[in-house]
Regions:
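Tandem CBS (Bateman) regulatory domains
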Residues: 1-13, 52-83, 87-97, 117-141
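Short charge-dense sequence patches
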Residues: 3-8, 20-24, 39-47, 114
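Short, flexible active-site loop motifs that bind/organize anionic cofactors or intermediates
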Residues: 13-16, 46, 81, 111
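The conserved cystathionine-beta-synthase
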Residues: 16-34, 41, 82-99, 106, ...
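A glycine-centered beta-loop-beta connector
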Residues: 30-33, 38-54, 95, 103-119
């Protein structure tokens, strides 16, 4: 059931950050758009890291000037990523084992092609399992 490629369910319109942006800029963007994390890309669109609200919180605890620091100084560069051809089942395992909420999807050149979320996998599973639309009232007892 989870043998389809992640490219079939991933989100392709992704808000990103650049390493030279300030943490303050990105914090405002994340608050405005209610985001918990952003992929960080270079100007060719290659994934170079990930910045999360936790990364920013951790940094502001030790750096009083955290808002003016650059994303590249705060971001996590050890990022688990998937390829567009990877299976939805692989993504599901990562979400369960690592408790990720979002995983970047990159091509062979490292360019960001999209992200897949745990919600994408849940929605995919429900649509495969139940051919008819699921209504909230049908789930609640």
């Amino acid at each position: 059931m989870m043998n389809e490629a992640v490219r079939t369910i991933m989100t392709t319109e992704v808000v990103t950050a650049y390493p030279e942006q300030t943490v303050g800029e990105i914090a405002e963007l994340m608050l405005r758009d209610q985001l918990q994390q952003l992929p960080v890309v270079d100007h060719e669109g290659r994934l170079v890291g990930l910045i999360t609200s936790y990364d920013m919180w951790r940094d502001c605890r030790v750096n009083p000037d955290s808002e003016s620091r650059l994303v590249g100084e705060v971001m996590n560069t050890r990022v688990i990523k998937l390829a567009p051809k990877d299976k939805v089942g692989t993504a599901a395992e990562l979400f369960m084992d690592r408790r990720f909420k979002t995983i970047p999807v990159v091509n062979l050149n490292g360019k960001l092609k999209g992200v897949i979320t745990a919600f994408d996998v849940i929605r995919y599973t429900l649509r495969k399992e139940y051919k008819e639309p699921i209504l909230f009232r049908d789930v609640i007892l």
